[in-house]
């Protein structure tokens, strides 16, 4: 546990006990309910300022954090990698020290996970991982919230991941341990989880299986999750598409899941590639609730980081 004078960072799900993650989600659920009832008059982060650092632009992350901070009574400013020359001019450590004198909390979206860790190590205010190449904990907190909103407690349930190995999958693996659900992973052999993630899974004791058969992974699952096959800037798109075609989430694959299974995707989706229109627009899809819950889950995270949530 962190000491009272240490900032409350949100860097990875593995860094925090389940009780703290649950406190954030409980706060998120309560704040969403109050917002829907027009009863969210409390502004627990009034007078607080969030600095949002983006290595590259992101519509969803920027809007959800900006709106979330405003709804909690605070304000935000956006800084881009181009503006800051992060790590190329002033060092990351010095940037962290300076920003800590100006703002109350920092959210950073940067591919280099080590840069996130260096920023957090030198900041005297909380730092939130908005996304790195290694993990995407804010997204998966929203996903857990969405599952429980639709299907009740996630503990003991089965989540199936089909497609590529990426940062969202890593955070799902971390969540499987923290929230005690089963995770079935199916990827092409050439795109299987990294050795580092495999080693972590083995040591974690989490109920996670890794395979190559999407039908086996999805069979009987309570939730099916996928993500885009080719991230922005990837140069081997055609090769990856050929490998991943058998992992498309379509009606046939969804029919193998539990009859009440839901479908999730963090968006943006490439329709006709990793998922068909029939599935993403169908009755089992909760992708837009999931997208909305980024806002609410991140409000819970912001409030926890700044001590407004126990």
From Swiss-Prot:
Its EC number is 2.1.3.3. The keyword Acyltransferase does not apply. L-ornithine binds at residues 167, 227, 231-232. It catalyses: carbamoyl phosphate + L-ornithine = L-citrulline + phosphate + H(+). Carbamoyl phosphate binds at residues 58-61, 85, 109, 136-139, 266-267, 294. It is found in: Cytoplasm. Keywords: Amino-acid biosynthesis, Arginine biosynthesis, Cytoplasm, Transferase. Pathway: Amino-acid biosynthesis; L-arginine biosynthesis; L-arginine from L-ornithine and carbamoyl phosphate: step 1/3. The keyword Transmembrane does not apply. SUPFAM superfamilies: Aspartate/ornithine carbamoyltransferase. One of its GO terms (molecular function) is ornithine carbamoyltransferase activity. Pfam families: OTCace, OTCace_N. One of its GO terms (biological process) is L-arginine biosynthetic process. One of its GO terms (cellular component) is cytoplasm. Belongs to the aspartate/ornithine carbamoyltransferase superfamily. OTCase family. Reversibly catalyzes the transfer of the carbamoyl group from carbamoyl phosphate (CP) to the N(epsilon) atom of ornithine (ORN) to produce L-citrulline. This is Ornithine carbamoyltransferase. The lineage of its organism: Bacteria, Pseudomonadati, Pseudomonadota, Alphaproteobacteria, Hyphomicrobiales. The gene is argF.
């Amino acid at each position: 546990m962190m000491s009272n004078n240490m900032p409350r960072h949100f860097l990875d799900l593995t860094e925090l006990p389940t009780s703290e993650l649950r406190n954030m989600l409980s706060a998120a659920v309560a704040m969403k309910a109050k917002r829907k009832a027009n009863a969210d008059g409390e502004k627990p982060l009034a007078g607080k300022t969030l600095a949002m650092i983006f290595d590259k632009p992101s519509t969803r992350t920027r809007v959800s954090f900006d709106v979330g901070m405003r709804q909690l009574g605070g304000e935000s400013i956006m800084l881009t990698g181009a503006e800051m020359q992060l790590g190329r001019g002033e060092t990351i450590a010095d940037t962290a020290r300076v920003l800590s004198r100006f703002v109350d909390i920092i959210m950073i979206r940067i591919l280099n996970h080590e840069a996130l860790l260096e920023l957090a190590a030198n900041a005297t205010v909380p730092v939130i991982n908005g996304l790195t190449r290694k993990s995407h904990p804010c997204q998966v907190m929203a996903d857990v919230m969405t599952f429980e909103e639709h299907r009740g407690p996630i503990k003991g349930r089965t989540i199936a991941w089909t497609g590529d190995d990426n940062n969202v999958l890593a955070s799902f693996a971390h969540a499987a341990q923290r929230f005690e659900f089963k995770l079935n992973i199916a990827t092409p052999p050439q795109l299987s989880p990294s050795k580092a993630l495999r080693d972590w899974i083995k040591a974690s004791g989490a109920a996670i299986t890794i395979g190559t058969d999407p039908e086996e992974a999805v069979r009987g699952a309570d939730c099916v999750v996928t993500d885009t096959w080719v991230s922005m800037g990837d140069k081997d798109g055609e090769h990856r598409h050929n490998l991943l075609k058998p992992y498309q989430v379509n009606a046939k694959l969804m029919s193998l899941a539990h009859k009440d299974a839901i479908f999730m995707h963090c968006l943006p989706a490439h329709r006709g590639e990793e998922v068909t229109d029939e599935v993403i627009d169908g009755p089992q899809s909760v992708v837009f609730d999931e997208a909305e819950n980024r806002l609410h889950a991140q409000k819970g995270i912001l409030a926890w980081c700044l001590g407004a949530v126990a």
